[in-house]
Amino acid sequence: MTNFTDGTTSGVVTKDMTNLGFKQLQVRVPDTFVWGTDSLIIDLTDYGAVDLAGVLAFEETTEGSVTIQATEGTTSVTSAGVATIVSGGDGTNGGTFLIWAY
């Protein structure tokens, strides 16, 4: 299992949705990400948040191509503002996580 952080991804894009009470983060993981095994660790405090409101994960079927929603048991836990997210699915592919935090 590999722990991917915002330093080992393609970066984090943020959108401040203050009127709705949360921030949206978009995190791109590289094609070496092993779905169902690897985890994504994000320090939410770096982005002005402390807890998760929701997570969606999209896995690429082929590099840079079609994405499918990884619906097979995406799990997460937050401790001291650090979110650890493990997505379901299988295969070694790139993908995108959409994270809503407050």
Model-assigned labels for residue ranges:
Residues 1-39, 93-102:
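Extracellular receptor-binding modules and their adjoining Ser/Thr/Gly/Asp/Asn-rich linkers
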Residues 4, 73-102:
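Surface-exposed interaction regions enriched in Ser/Thr/Asp/Glu
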Residues 10-18, 66-78:
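Short, exposed beta-strand/loop patches in secreted or surface proteins that constitute
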Residues 22-26, 54, 80:
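Short, hydrophobic/aromatic-rich segments at coil-to-beta transitions
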Residues 32, 45-47, 60-61, 88, ...:
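Generic structural motif
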Residues 37-46, 85-86:
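Exposed aromatic-hydrophobic patches
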Residues 46-52, 92:
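Short proline/glycine-enriched turn/loop motifs at strand-loop junctions of beta-rich domains
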